[in-house]
Structure formats: C-alpha cells, structure tokens
Amino acid sequence: MSFDHLLTSSKRRELLQNLGIGHGSDVFSTGLFRKAECNAETAISQRSIPRANPDHLRPIFDRFATKEIKGKKLMTPEDFIRGYLGLYTEENYNKETVRLLASAADTTKDGDISFEEFCAFEALLCSPDALYLTAFELFDRNASDTISCDEFEAVIRHTQPLHDQDFDFSSEFIKRYFGADKQRNVNYHSFCQLLHDFYEEQGIQAFKRYDKNGNGTISSLDFQQIMTTVKGHLLTDFVRHNLIAVSGGGASGHKFSDTRGGFVTFPYYAAFNSLLAKMELIKRVYVSTTRGNLDIEMTKEEFLHAIQSYTQVTPYEVEILFHLSELNHPGRKTLCLKDIQAIDPERLKRVSQMDRLINIKAVHHKDDRGVGTAFLESAYRFLLGSVAGACGATAVYPIDLVKTRMQNQRTSGSFVGEVMYKNSLDCFKKVVKFEGLLGLYRGLLPQIVGVAPEKAIKLTMNDYMRDKFTKDGKIPLYGEIIAGGTGGMCQVVFTNPLEIVKIRLQTAGEVQQAGKKIGVFTVLKELGFLGLYKGSRACFLRDIPFSAIYFPAYAHAKLASADEDGMNSPGTLFASAFIAGVPAAGLVTPADVIKTRLQVAARAGQTTYNGVIDCARKLIKEEGPMSLWKGTAARVCRSSPQFAVTLLTYEVLQRLFYVDFAGSRPTGSELATTKTIQDESSTNPDHVGGYKLAAATFSGIEHKFGLFLPKFETSK
C-alpha cells in the first residue's frame, strides 16, 4: 500500500470497509459509518497474516453472539471479549475494562458488535499498524474519527498507573496537543505521537511531584515507587527487584555520582528510563556486533565502540546498562544476551532462512540440560552426519577411484605394463572404456557403509570438543585444532577397515585374474581381522592433521563469508567447505600415498613395505620425492567437493530438522531477531485470520504504551 499521502482517520476507516466487508455491501453507508474507496489488492500485500474469509467468520460469529435485534444477531462486549477471545474470564472481572476493549471493534459505539463490525475489526488486526489503530479505537468513544481531550482523559484515568500516580491534565504538555482551551481534537497520526510522548511526560510529572525541594533529586525509594507504578510496563522482575541497588540505595558497591547518598538526580532518572525504552536498539546492536553468536560476552569498551554510529544511545545509558549487567552476575563487567533478556522483557527468537520440516524443543532452558540430553544431542548429530557423509561420498566417488588408481601406480620396477595411466584424466577415460560407467563406482557400497559412521563420528566429535573448548561464545584457535584432530583420530577406528576393503576393490579391476571374481567377502576372508587395520598408523598420520587443518579453516571461512547478521546461506556454506578442503587435502597427501601403498595388495614383482617409515624411505629411493605427492590434484578435487557436499548437507539438515537441545548450534545457521506479535498468535481454532492476533494486540497495547487496564472490580 502506498502511504505517499497522509493516512487520515477517514481513509483508515475506508480501508476497513473494503477489507472487512467486500464489494456490494452498503452497510457502511448508513448511520455513523464513513464510506469510501480503497485499493484492497495493494493492501493485501502489506498484511503479515492472511485475511479470514467472511464465509468462515459468519458461523463463528453466530455461535458466540447472544443478542438479537429484529432478526439480526449481535455480540455484546462480554460475548466478544470473554466468550470469543477468552479474556477476562474471572468472575469478578472489571466491566468497564471489558466494555472499553470491545469498543475497539464497535465502530458505531452503540454498545454492540454487528457481523460487519466483527469482519472490519478482523481486517484492522491484519494491518501493519494494528497496535496503534486498535488503541485509537479505544480512545475514540463517540466514533468521530478524532480524539478530544475529554476522551483521552477518560480512558487514561481508567488505567492502573493513574490509580497510583495522578496526572495534571491542565499541564502545558496537554495544551500543546489539545490547545490552550483543550477544545482541539487530534487525528490518528497526532494521537499516535501523543500516546508515544504521554508516558515520558507522566514520568517527568511524577519526578517533579517527589522532588519537593525542586533541586532535581529524589530518594531511591521514590525512584522505586515511580518506576513500579508509572513505568511498570518497562520492568522485568530482575530490574524491579534491583531498583534500589541500581539507584545507589542498596548494598551494591557500584555507585554513580548521580545516585550517591540514596538520592537519584534527574539526569540519571532520564537516562535510566531512556535505556529501558531503547532496549530493542541495544539488542540489535549486540546481535549485529556478535554476528549472530548469542553466547559472546562484550566488554563496555567493545559496546561503546559498537554504538558509535547510533547517536540515540548515550555513554551514560551504556554505563547504567553495564551496571545492571554486573548485578546479574557480580564480579563480571561484561554484557551477554542473558543480561539483555533480564533487562528487556521481549525475548529473542532464532530464525533460519529455510522453513523447518521439524521444529522440536527438547529442552526449554540451558540449565535443564543433563547427561541424557547431551547424549541425545550427540545421537542427533551422528544421525545427520551419517546421511551427510553418505551424500558426500556418493557425489565424488568416481574422483576417489581415479585418485586411488593413480596413487597405486608404480613408476619403477620390472613389472610389465605397470604404467597404465598417463594422468588422472587418462585414468578416468580408461576406466570408463574398459570397465564401463559402473566401473567408476566399484566399491561404492562399502564406501557408503564406512563413510556414514566415519563422517558422523568425525563431525560429532568435532562438535562435541568444540563445545567443551567454547567459553562465553568464543573458542581459541588451539581449541579448534584439538577439536578437529580429535574428530579425525576417532574416525580411524571406522575408516581403516573400510578404506582397505575399498582400495582392494578399486584396484581389483586393473588386472583381471581368470575365473576369479573379487568381492567384499573375498577381501575380508583374505585379510582377516588384524589385516583390516593394516596401515592404521598411516591413517592416523593422514586423518588427524587433515581434520586439525580442515575444521578450523572451515569455521573461519564461514565467519568471513557470513552476511552482516552472521548468517551463512547454502552458497557460502558450500564455498567455505570447499575452500577449507584445499589446504587440508593437499598438505596431507604424502600420508595418504603411504596409507594407500600399505593397504593395497602388492602383485608379483612389486616392492613390499614394512610400516610407514619403510614405505616412505623406499618411495623416495625408488620413485623420487615427488612420488609422495602423487594424486595431489585428484585428492584435492575429490576431498574438497566431498567435504563441501558433506558439510553443506550436515548443516542444511540441522536447519530443516530442527531440534533445540539448548546447546550450541552451527554458527551462521540462525538469525537472532525479536519476537513479533505473530509469534504470540492464538491457537484457538475459532480465532481465524486477524483474530489470531487479537489477544496479543490487546496485550501489546498494555506493554508497549503502558495502558494497563484493571482486571477486577474494586470494592466500593
């Protein structure tokens, strides 16, 4: 919807008419209704929740409407608020509050809600500024499209803060909005600004009331009284319980010059309230600076540097913020997400760029994690790692076969026809020519069976060890290296037996033996149990350095390629995993060559090797130092895409099949953002369309604007 023109109150009601009733209705042409035109198609694009079909709303309305006049069903305020929305269901509910809330839907202000009004309010709740529109309807008591001073005062005096702290409705603040004689009415946009500024003015008046000497100071107890009555909607339990301590009236050792001796100056009072009102901005600065890593703790100096581009936040407010943070964890002068959430009642939610196929919250809080939860988390990672490993291995298996053939090719000795392949491309062509396309996948089954647990245990152990080394959201480089190396070491117990079987099958096609078909069981019978671990030292020599190089490189590549919110798209995940594989695969090629020579079955006339050192010595002596780097290109071309596919699949699966164990998540997989009103939508099947947000909207009016309405009738 275009807002190039001023959205006046009358135009707003026109929008409600067209959205709520549809074409052909003349209901809004009678009585106190205003009628006009609206581009409903453009309005639809602005709604964050789909509109309900009036045909679906009709039976719902008829079921809850208990009043009937001349054959037309109507909802009373009690029908709408208590019956349909399920609010204020207590026996001693405040009747004026229920009537006032229902008046938001009662466009004619006649005390009842018709079906047309019911539909119109559903449309209003779908609009982007539903919070302010609903508040405007609460104050517009005579359906005039404007708010008079008397209307504003009547509603404000019914709110809970005015029961505890009076307000001067003859002040200059009120006169600036309603005129010196208070006879000027305000329209919708002016009302929005009035509502925004009112509670700041109310706080100033409350301060003046307690500042009896007029010297700009109040006591800590007076400060607590003002904050709990006038500013109660800004307080969490943590802040409410620490008001005396933070204002210098308690035992806290941290005292500001403006809060010494149990007194609070107006600058401190203003900065404190301003900070609470800006907590949403504080949260955004923290999330942006930490690049989505919500476990990082920031120092005051780091935070001051981060807010340099935000002129709205003053150093005084930051000082108060870190004082509150220190009260949350005495002895540590840092700021973390827990501190922000202790100060700000609005919670962050974590969202992914992908729609989750599964969304399970296994643990509601990190403190609830136990041994069983940690085990389930590792099992979850192991399962996804197995699938990811199988995908990665299948994708690059032909390259792996070429690499193995090239590394096993001898370039010296008397064996006739030993040099079969000129290079990797020649090897690929000859395999396809003499063994067919399926020859490129010879030995794939044991490879998949092996790679599934191999990659799973490597990924799981790396994640597990990274969790152990991570403190305050940060992990040192040596911790990353040890975590990666541990993952590589643990995988060898799975890798070695399956690698040797894979290599025997991959090289079996080079020289065919008449009448002898070589399969998995043939190789197992020939090797025996101990033979399956032949060359295990070379496996350790290859896999530990590879993982110690790969995982830190991958983590840093992800961080470098993340967007400003710390998010990694599938493209950057693949690129990061691919790039990390180049140095990791290339630098450990000598160990891979030695492992291959030890595990392959030597044919008649070929050199045999007795261990890692003997193999390395004979290779250098017989084939030259460069023989240790045979197949480097093929290995890099195989390992880089394999791990790129594996890590991409592993992280994407964690996003699609989301299970929250209250532990660490892969960096860059989630964006931390504030919960919106849509996150509080009703699950009641009768609450369709905009009515999913009705209760959350009324609650938002209370907590955003401080319009706390009394729930119960007061005794006379």
Swiss-Prot record:
Residues 372-664 are annotated as: Carrier domain. Ca(2+) 1 binds at D106, T108, D110, E117. Ca(2+) 2 binds at D140, N142, S144, T146, E151. Gene3D superfamilies: EF-hand (1.10.238.10), Mitochondrial carrier domain (1.50.40.10). Ca(2+) 3 binds at D211, N213, N215, T217, D222. Residues 665-716 are annotated as: C-terminal domain. One of its GO terms (biological process) is malate-aspartate shuttle. Residues 1-345 are annotated as: N-terminal domain. It is a multi-pass membrane protein. It comes from the Eukaryota. PANTHER family: CALCIUM-BINDING MITOCHONDRIAL CARRIER PROTEIN ARALAR1, MITOCHONDRIAL 2-OXODICARBOXYLATE CARRIER 1-RELATED. Homodimer (via N-terminus). This is Probable calcium-binding mitochondrial carrier K02F3.2.
